[in-house]
Amino acid sequence: MKTNLLNYDLQGLTRHFADMGEKPFRAKQVMRWMHQSGAQNFDEMTDLAKSLRHKLNEQASIEIPKLMMSQESSDGTRKWLLDVGTGNGVETVFIPESDRGTLCISSQVGCALECTFCSTGRQGFNRNLTAAEIIGQLWWANKAMGVTPKNERVISNVVMMGMGEPMANFDNVVTALSIMLDDHGYGLSRRRVTVSTSGMVPQMDRLRDVMPVALAVSLHASNDEVRNQIVPLNKKYPLKELMAACQRYLVKAPRDFITFEYVMLDGVNDKAQHAYELIELVKDVPCKFNLIPFNPFPNSGYERSSNENIRIFRDILQQAEFVVTVRKTRGDDIDAACGQLAGQVQDKTRRQQKWQQILIGQQG
């Protein structure tokens, strides 16, 4: 079987070329061809010796996930569905803004966690994505979006906030991050690459040590009672442990704050008392809040908080001198908004079946 070179960061490529008896600089050349020029085969790599190209064609490949579907929202948001084999597809979303272009990347086929308000979680879980399948999303988006009139890349920021829990696919995510940051890859700044987690504490510590990029934490609750219900991972890593991990992460983080993401669920976590509890919870963690109006999906069982409740919640946090943004809903007409990504998941957990049985029971 041929080796897919998209699975390697520069260190891995260098080892691979050493095993082939080639000099280390070949790794940098090939990496630039793949990620900066968008090369899909070795014959395009004209500065490589013909003998090396022949050897690479025999032993290696550049396998990028196939594009199944592309959609564009009325607000300019774009979504791609990529085929990752065996009936599975993952979604990637590009969000244009006046000062930046952000790509939201998936890390798993489905999600192993079961956050109750998330469409991806309802789809169940099939497998982790390979490093090639993760970086392949940026490859596709980069090819589709091109460059600005000033010859700058349209994609300036990457957030690991698509399908899946990135920390549960740690090694492959770190390899993909390494390619994103490498000057021979995409040359992104650590400050402009964000990994989001629901709170896998040991992996947060590992990421801090090996690849400290910006960190976002899917918080969504101000106390353990509520969070246990809507983010079941909290039963393993409760809020006290999570806050301590956030403090440790900041020691090496490229930004001097953690972003806490908080989906606003009507009657669940959006009362004034929850805002005051949040203030107490995060008092020792430099942070900013991103309030996310819930994006409905069929049979979710939740409603979006009213604009008034969101405003009151925001004002309480701001009065306590926190930076607070209320996320604009982008791409909801193509199901590309936060919490709506579902892709195509051949579920191995029977979670889809479980939710169907619950719904049948509710309708009966």
Curated annotation (Swiss-Prot):
Subcellular location(s) per record = Cytoplasm
Q: How is the cofactor bound?
A: Binds 1 [4Fe-4S] cluster. The cluster is coordinated with 3 cysteines and an exchangeable S-adenosyl-L-methionine.
User: What cofactors does this protein use?
Assistant: [4Fe-4S] cluster
UniProt key word Membrane: no
Question: Among the entry's GO cellular component annotations, what is one?
Answer: cytoplasm
Q: Which Pfam families match?
A: Radical_SAM, RlmN_N
What InterPro entries has UniProt attached to this entry?
Aldolase_TIM (IPR013785), Methyltransferase_A (IPR040072), RlmN_N (IPR048641), RNA_MTrfase_RlmN (IPR027492), rRNA_lsu_MTrfase_RlmN/Cfr (IPR004383), rSAM (IPR007197)
Reactions it catalyzes: adenosine(2503) in 23S rRNA + 2 reduced [2Fe-2S]-[ferredoxin] + 2 S-adenosyl-L-methionine = 2-methyladenosine(2503) in 23S rRNA + 5'-deoxyadenosine + L-methionine + 2 oxidized [2Fe-2S]-[ferredoxin] + S-adenosyl-L-homocysteine; adenosine(37) in tRNA + 2 reduced [2Fe-2S]-[ferredoxin] + 2 S-adenosyl-L-methionine = 2-methyladenosine(37) in tRNA + 5'-deoxyadenosine + L-methionine + 2 oxidized [2Fe-2S]-[ferredoxin] + S-adenosyl-L-homocysteine
Enzyme Commission code: 2.1.1.192
The biological processes this protein is annotated with in GO are: rRNA base methylation; tRNA methylation
Record key words, sorted: 4Fe-4S, Cytoplasm, Disulfide bond, Iron, Iron-sulfur, Metal-binding, Methyltransferase, rRNA processing, S-adenosyl-L-methionine, Transferase, tRNA processing
- Positions annotated as active site in the UniProt record: E91 (proton acceptor), C338 (s-methylcysteine intermediate)
Q: Which domain of life is it from?
A: Bacteria
Q: Is-annotated flag, keyword Repressor?
A: no
What more the UniProt record tells us is:
Reaction proceeds by a ping-pong mechanism involving intermediate methylation of a conserved cysteine residue.
Provide the family line.
Belongs to the radical SAM superfamily. RlmN family.
Know the name of this protein?
Dual-specificity RNA methyltransferase RlmN
Q: Which organism is it from?
A: Neisseria gonorrhoeae (strain ATCC 700825 / FA 1090)
Question: Could you read off the lineage of the organism from its UniProt record?
Answer: Bacteria, Pseudomonadati, Pseudomonadota, Betaproteobacteria, Neisseriales
Quick one: which gene encodes this?
rlmN
